[in-house]
Amino acid sequence: FPYTTLFRSMSQSCNIVFAELAMELGKDKMTEEAEKMGFGSSFTIDGVPTLASSYDVSKAETRDLGWSGIGQYTDLVNPMHLNILMGAIANGGVYVTPYYIDSIKTPFGLPTYVGYGTPGERLLKSETADALKDIMRYTVETNYGDSMFPGLTVCAKTGTGEIGEDKNPNGWMTGFTLDSDCPLAFTIVVENSGFGMAQAGPIAQQLLQSAAAIVRGQ
């Protein structure tokens, strides 16, 4: 393209745009924003701490900094952290801690524990969250197609994480729904598989349809 926009760049996975933005922002700003978004922090879910995601460009050369801007270099992300981040984008920047256990009941059916989401801290400015929501919605509308998620209004992005050593890349898809009667966040990673859309996409499609049926009582 002779020119591009953030919307088109995200939709078409135009890596060079995000690499250039990372180099323009510089190490300090990139690190600061990554930490605000939860990189380097652990999230405790039902008493179980997650392994912290990592963004470290302290020793990065200029080209390495650009590489980090597209999720490569030494970047590491925990799928649960990414899913929490998706929930934060959907919620205007504030995350809600998910839970693994829905409920625990006695042999007589009396509940002794009921799981519930706990509001957490702000990971993004509300305007940033809204902008990302619009961009991810555009990505589904113009690239993946709404027919992929019938009955749902989805914001999503795929990813293909190269891991080197002659291994196949990790295929990713992450996102959330905009449906008030079916608020879902999802993150799929298929390790050593291939491209995100080809590998994680079909799983995300089936997962959302099944989850929506449960939430909506269908």
What are these model-derived regions, one by one?
Residues L124, N192-A200:
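Short alpha-helix boundary/capping segments
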Residues N78-I84, Q199-Q206:
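Short amphipathic alpha-helical face segments that pack within enzyme cores
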Residues P183, F195-M197, I214:
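Intrinsically disordered, low-complexity acidic/polar segments
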Residues F1-V190:
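Beta-lactam-recognizing serine transpeptidase/beta-lactamase-like catalytic domain environment
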Residues Q12, Q72, M173, Q199, ...:
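Residue-identity detector for glutamine
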Residues P111-Y113, G117, I203-Q218:
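Short, gly/Ser/Thr-rich active-site loops of penicillin-recognizing serine hydrolases
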